[in-house]
UniProtKB/Swiss-Prot annotation:
Motif ('HIGH' region): 45-55
Superkingdom of this protein's organism: Bacteria
Enzyme Commission number(s) of this protein: 6.3.1.13
PANTHER family per the UniProt record, alphabetical: CYSTEINE--TRNA LIGASE, CYTOPLASMIC, CYSTEINYL-TRNA SYNTHETASE
Essential cofactor(s): Zn(2+)
Organism for this UniProt entry: Tsukamurella paurometabola (strain ATCC 8368 / DSM 20162 / CCUG 35730 / CIP 100753 / JCM 10117 / KCTC 9821 / NBRC 16120 / NCIMB 702349 / NCTC 13040) (Corynebacterium paurometabolum)
Summary of subunit composition and partner proteins: Monomer.
CDD domains to which the protein is assigned, alphabetical: Anticodon_Ia_Cys_like (cd07955), CysRS_core (cd00672)
Motif 'KMSKS' region, residue range(s) on this chain: 289-293
Protein name (record): L-cysteine:1D-myo-inositol 2-amino-2-deoxy-alpha-D-glucopyranoside ligase
Amino acid sequence: MRSWPSPAVPTLSGPSVPLRLYDTSDQAVRSVNPGAVSGMYVCGITPYDATHLGHAATYLTFDLINRVLRANGHEVHYVQNVTDVDDPLFERAARDGIDWRDLGARETDLFCEDMQALRVLAPQDYIGAVESIDEVIALVGRLLENGAAYIVDDPEFPDVYYRTDATEQFGYESGYDRATMERFFAERGGDPDRPGKRDPLDALLWRAARPGEPSWPSPQGPGRPGWHIECAAIAQNRLGVGFDIQGGGSDLIFPHHEFSAAHVEADTGERRFARHYVHAAMIGLDGEKMSKSRGNLVFVSTLRRAGVDPAAIRLGLFEGHYRTDRAWSDEVLARAQARLDLWRNAFAAASSPDGAELVGRLRRYLADDLDTPKALSALDAWAHRAVTSGGPDPDGPSTVATAVDALLGVAVSA
């Protein structure tokens, strides 16, 4: 699947600062310490609607990680999926009287346009679930063979499920207790009451074909993948086991990331699917959670059509820390645009305070669990001084502009 063109990223001079990130599984900030090539998998969209600001905040978080790692001299093997086989896509397509494949392609194209406008670095591998069906079938077969999966006793719909007790470490990624797991499983696409399951938490691996649903042939009979096994297969086949970062929104901690990890761990015998589990918080609107059910989603494409500078969207979402639930509002956007105008005026100044010193601080702040509030505050103070009184560094404006482009993904000019 084709993604989108990546913007050019300037090369930064000066010493690198090792990246430290909060690991959900350890509930602590830990050093990432990748090798020459850092592997990162981020769960992608289900393409039944346009990209909203909650999506954007997640992908901008991992774009920052990508940029910090690259600035530190690492190559990044970035993999992202598209969940183009899923119930919400089928339901929306049926509601709108459109083929689910056409809807998925249309919304994936719009997502790519939004990511390009936001200057998000594209993944090296951008893989749809439809493209990975054979990989899923192979993984399901291995899990059945080693006893980590079973077929429910249902002659009409013999679905395949993963045994939650297949590995002794199940639950380490989220750290949730049983009651919390059961609640989130029911709320987030699980089927705890499905007759024939051995445990209410057992996760669907292969859904036997139902009338009116797309299906693919397999040794287990015609059907389609479950949600979690798609990401497990895609990541395993491109990054292996023990890659650096598994990422997504905080709503994916459980069940999605817990089970994706468990599927691969049960297949390979390894104890840790990824070395770090990193999650971005949720975005609300005017103090309320942003959600489909509330009808208060703010779409990136809508803001773009209204003439909003995508760089202002980036800065508005960077105003708060990535792990803090936060609200979007007209005031947030206005502050972001004012900040962007100030910075661009400073980049055009004849001189400024010491640019290299500021860049060093920016690298330290972003390497410290992506502390964008500190980074933005430091840039504001520098820019205000550059605009009002200049400074002793004639190269400062260009030095800082290059760093802002490389690290924050904000272009010097509109």
